[in-house]
């Protein structure tokens, strides 16, 4: 059997920019697929392309990234999804404070380009593993980026937390349930609101490595217990917890609804923690 690889959780390849507009038939097909498994469009989160570096100090690169984020947000809104999450990118040689201004400007540009809809699709910053000078590794960095968004648009923004990224960035969520709660408390206190989603991933690399390499829950450096602790925290009730763990099936047709074996194991593990 080939080794598991990470599944596609984006609308298409996350490593390339996308410029096409979603046509109504595609939106209808997506809604029908969600309905088949008992989900409303608001249960959907879209991950923007990884290549969008909205924090870049290079003017042209930052401009293209902002334009790309706006297009991603337009398509996410067309789907009626809850939010479009993205990695802010790297500050490069510039100061983090200056990079935060550029990220905030890109978020505002996306929100201003698309009228607010009923329910309000949001632009959501995802925390990062902290490689190089990437923005978003700490609650303070996320808070300063969101603070750059005009007050009139701020309610259409937010953030989410990836467990692999937290661990890789040096947040000790693996030590105990109490330490995990302290980390979540710090993000909520500093940013002023709870996360809009969690990405549930174990880590292939050790604590504080700054490497973003996902592993199956309980089979990486984090271990299984932190996920039990997380699900026992009241903050996860009603907040989407999304698996981004490696899959075993490397090629899956768009119309194939068969569960990936690795995904099925992960869901069973999480349900066991919940006693369901």
Predicted features by range, described:
Residues 135-143, 167-238, 246, 254-261:
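Gly/Pro-rich active-site loop or hairpin
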Residues 252-276:
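C-terminal helical cap(s) of enzyme catalytic domains, especially alpha/beta-barrels
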Residues 13-15, 49-51, 89-91, 126-130, ...:
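Active-site beta-loop-alpha junctions enriched in small/polar residues
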Residues 1-46, 52-71, 276:
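N-terminal pre-domain/capping segments
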Residues 24-46, 103-118, 145-150, 221-233:
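Alpha-helix-loop-beta-strand connector modules within alpha/beta enzyme cores
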Residues 18-29, 56-68, 94-105, 133-144, ...:
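Alpha-helix N-cap and loop-to-helix initiation/capping positions
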